[in-house]
């Protein structure tokens, strides 16, 4: 379901409307890490296009960068969010193979991305940046309403690169690859004063809201 009176649907699991409801439908600021082509299953497209949110879309996948730039009016970055800035890392992506629709949007850091892919993936090199450094680079506000993380295995690396004392983030949605990663994510979030809410056992995505 999309904006009132329409059948539009963007976010796969309704994270866009969840973010809207918990921000009382006011204009906000988002960070979309793993934004892919900017539209397909996007947690932030509706926020930007229909509710005038501002934000940053990040994805180092070279096969979706052009589409993301064309689809979004907000800041777009092809840097790779990681736990250390200034590294060059091997990166895997599937690319334009329509017979594997859905899979073709999957990509990630080599060694962290799932190996459960239908075909051999392409190789790429990416430049890394911590989430803190990225937010500083693009002059993000210190108060951020919503961060969406969908990075195919490197969720821990993204979170450990964020200075939680510097940036006051109200909400996170975080996809996880397995239960081991999920437990580590939950530990990081709980020690930084976040509660896990609205999780669905059928989905590999958890939502967090900051206490207070």
Task: Briefly describe each language-model feature range.
Residues 1-212:
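Phosphate/nucleotide-binding beta-alpha loop and adjacent structural elements of enzyme active sites
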């Amino acid at each position: 379901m999309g904006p009132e009176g329409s059948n539009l649907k963007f976010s796969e699991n309704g994270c866009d409307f969840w973010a809207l409801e918990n921000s009382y439908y006011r204009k906000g600021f988002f960070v979309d890490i793993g934004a892919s082509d900017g539209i397909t299953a996007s947690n932030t497209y509706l926020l930007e296009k229909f509710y005038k949110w501002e934000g940053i879309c990040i994805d180092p996948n070279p096969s979706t960068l052009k589409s993301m730039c064309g689809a979004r009016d907000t800041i777009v970055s092809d840097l790779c969010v990681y736990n250390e800035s200034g590294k060059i890392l091997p990166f895997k992506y599937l690319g334009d193979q329509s017979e594997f629709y859905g899979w073709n949007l999957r990509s990630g850091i080599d060694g962290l991305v799932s190996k459960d892919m239908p075909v051999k993936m392409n190789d790429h090199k990416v430049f890394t940046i911590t989430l803190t450094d990225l937010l500083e680079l693009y002059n993000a506000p210190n108060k951020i309403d919503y961060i969406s993380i969908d990075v195919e295995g490197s969720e821990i690396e993204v979170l450990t690169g964020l200075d939680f004392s510097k940036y006051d983030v109200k909400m996170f949605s975080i996809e996880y690859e397995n239960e081991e990663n999920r437990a580590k994510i939950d530990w990081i979030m709980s020690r930084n004063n976040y509660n896990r809410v609205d999780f669905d056992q059928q989905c590999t995505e958890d939502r967090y809201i900051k206490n207070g």
